[in-house]
A protein has these predicted regions:
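Glycine-rich phosphate/diphosphate-binding loop of Rossmann-like nucleotide-binding domains
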Residues: 1-46
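Glycine-rich phosphate/nucleotide-binding loop
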Residues: 28, 32-135
């Protein structure tokens, strides 16, 4: 995707409810979203984390940015356990993992579905390709 549509999940219930449930949305998340929008990143939010994934399910966005790992994993696994991919952020190199994790418990049994692993690999390759072309 050359210009993915992204939505940001809030950290606090009800996206902070104007500071009643926490100030992170007001002090950190909203300003960050606004900075990204000013840089022409196609991003919106923050949205309440209990409903933001409905946007993805409806095809309205290409990705959801979550505030912590498990916030995104529940929805990701429910919507596509066999094809879900997690992209790690905040580090100087691309890291992707299949939503199901390592699945060591079934390694070597011939029962694993490699769809999510292939998708994670493809996304990592795409990220490296774009990263190298931007350098």
């Amino acid at each position: 995707l050359s210009r993915p549509r992204l939505s940001v999940a809030a950290l606090n219930p009800h996206a902070g409810d104007n500071g009643n449930f926490g100030m992170e949305e007001i002090e950190v998340i909203n300003p960050t979203v606004e900075t990204l929008q000013a840089k022409q990143v196609n991003v919106d939010g923050p949205w309440p984390s209990d409903t933001v994934f409905l946007k993805a399910k409806a095809g309205e966005v290409d990705g959801i940015i979550t505030m912590y790992h498990d916030q995104g994993q529940i929805a990701l696994k429910l919507m596509g356990f066999d094809r879900g991919v997690t992209v790690q952020g905040g580090i100087p190199f691309p890291v992707t993992t299949p939503a199901h994790g390592t699945a060591f418990d079934i390694a070597g049994t011939g029962s694993a579905d490699v769809g999510a692993t292939r998708a994670a690999f493809d996304i990592a390759c795409d990220m490296v390709s774009h990263w190298n072309s931007a350098a």
